[in-house]
Amino acid sequence: MTLKWHIIPTGRVWVDPGGAFGLVPRSMWQKHQPPNQDQLIPMDLNSLLIFSGDKVILVDSGIGDKLSPKAMEIWGIEWPEGTMLENLKKWGVKREDVDIVINTHLHSDHSGGNTRIVDGKIEPTFPNAIYMVQENEYFDATHTNVRTRATYLPEN
């Protein structure tokens, strides 16, 4: 069986460099990724589109577009290369064509595109897909605590 895969841009967020670089000294990382005037760096979000036989598989669905305007401003969300659905269309894939969505984990920047809002109601973005995630991750996402509550959104 032949696999064909493509990187699908799903957005960009602006984040504190500490999360990306941890203990690496600023003098080292800023040569490669200078921060903006707010001391934030861009983090591009990507999904993986896989064609496997007659199956269309999406690994992670990106941040989606359901966040409030305030949340979008806080995260600095942008779509410089278009939205996930626009980028899937470039490969001839409509949302109805996706057979499987594999979530590596359920943080919003990876699973926000699992659902969308239509007429004020949440519905699956990929209506014909089977959505998959590790059992332990699903448990963590549905049993949040004060530390994890903001990272797992029920609507995703």
What are these regions (language model features)?
Residues 108, 112, 130:
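Phosphate-coordination/substrate-recognition cap region in phosphate-metabolizing enzymes
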Residues 69-70, 113-115, 142-146:
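A short secondary-structure junction signal
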